[in-house]
Swiss-Prot record:
Biased composition range(s): Polar residues: 214-228
Disordered: annotated segments: 188-228
Domain LOB: start-end pairs: 16-118
PROSITE patterns from the UniProt entry: LOB
Other remarks on this protein: Plants over-expressing LBD30 have a dwarf and bushy phenotype, with short petioles, curled downward leaves, ectopic shoots from the adaxial side of cotyledons, shrunken root tips and disorganized columella cells.
Role played: Involved in the positive regulation of tracheary element (TE) differentiation. Involved in a positive feedback loop that maintains or promotes NAC030/VND7 expression that regulates TE differentiation-related genes.
PANTHER family: LOB DOMAIN CONTAINING PROTEIN (PTHR31529), LOB DOMAIN-CONTAINING PROTEIN 30 (PTHR31529:SF4)
Tissue expression as described in the entry: Expressed in roots, stems, leaves and flowers. Expressed in vascular tissues of hypocotyls, leaves, roots, developing floral organs and siliques.
Top-rank taxon: Eukaryota
Biological processes per GO annotation: organ boundary specification between lateral organs and the meristem; xylem development
Protein name per its UniProtKB record: LOB domain-containing protein 30
Family as reported in the entry's similarity comment: Belongs to the LOB domain-containing protein family.
One Pfam family here: LOB
Length: 228
């Protein structure tokens, strides 16, 4: 099949007939509709399939209705359909179209899978939480001396002991009663200094002064103390 040619050169006067006329065993006249598209060498085999499927007269009428600049594409389509029909008499070129459509669907599925996989690779992965380097370094070098010192609470003990000490101090500041008030002789005159010390301790811890005896009863008080 030839996509170009000069009809006059394929006519009976200038050379051999075109492939279509050669197959039909007729004289190729000037202006043959098949001469530009079916050469004398390989055109006869291609035109044989076209003639068997569509018929030479039908193809001639079809090409006359097609614009001249679109005739080469029309001849290619006619030849392809004729050869497909010879290979598959039932479906013809439809089987080839279905096969191509299945390939398209398969390729689209593969493309979608690859695009989804590529999208997952482009998404930023969440970073695991990491301890700052400065914090980790300080934790590793941490020692007892680095721990914050907690100062113990300062308790004012004076508030606890002040009442007791003040009362003791007040009692100590009170003038001691002399020994002659109780009719007790001095330690130099008495050998029992322990009784006097016990009496003094009782007076200090008791916090009360014994009633002073009247001048008339000094002897009785002294006698009571001596009995004790």
């Amino acid at each position: 099949m030839s996509s170009s040619g000069n009809p006059s050169s394929s006519s009976g006067g200038g050379g051999g007939p075109c492939g279509a006329c050669k197959f039909l065993r007729r004289k190729c006249v000037a202006g043959c509709i098949f001469a530009p598209y079916f050469d004398s060498e390989q055109g006869a085999a291609h035109f044989a399939a076209v003639h068997k499927v569509f018929g030479a007269s039908n193809v001639s009428k079809l090409l006359h209705h097609v614009p001249e600049h679109k005739r080469p594409d029309a001849v290619v389509s006619i030849c392809f359909e004729a050869q497909a029909r010879l290979r598959d008499p039932i479906y013809g070129c439809v089987s080839h179209i279905v096969s191509l459509q299945q390939q398209v669907v398969s390729l689209q599925t593969e493309l979608s899978y690859l695009q989804a996989h590529l999208a997952t690779l482009e998404l930023p992965q969440p970073q695991p939480p990491q301890v700052p380097v400065s914090s980790s370094g300080s934790l590793q070098a941490l020692s007892i001396t680095d721990l914050p010192t907690i100062s113990p609470s300062v308790y004012d003990l004076s508030s606890i002991f002040e009442p007791v000490m003040s009362s003791t101090w007040a009692m100590q500041q009170q003038p001691r009663p002399s020994d002659h008030l109780f009719g007790v002789p001095s330690s130099s005159n008495m050998g029992g200094g322990g009784e006097l010390q016990a009496l003094a301790r009782e007076f200090i811890h008791g916090g009360q002064m014994p009633a002073q005896p009247s001048p008339g009863t000094s002897g009785s008080a002294s006698s009571v103390i001596k009995r004790e």
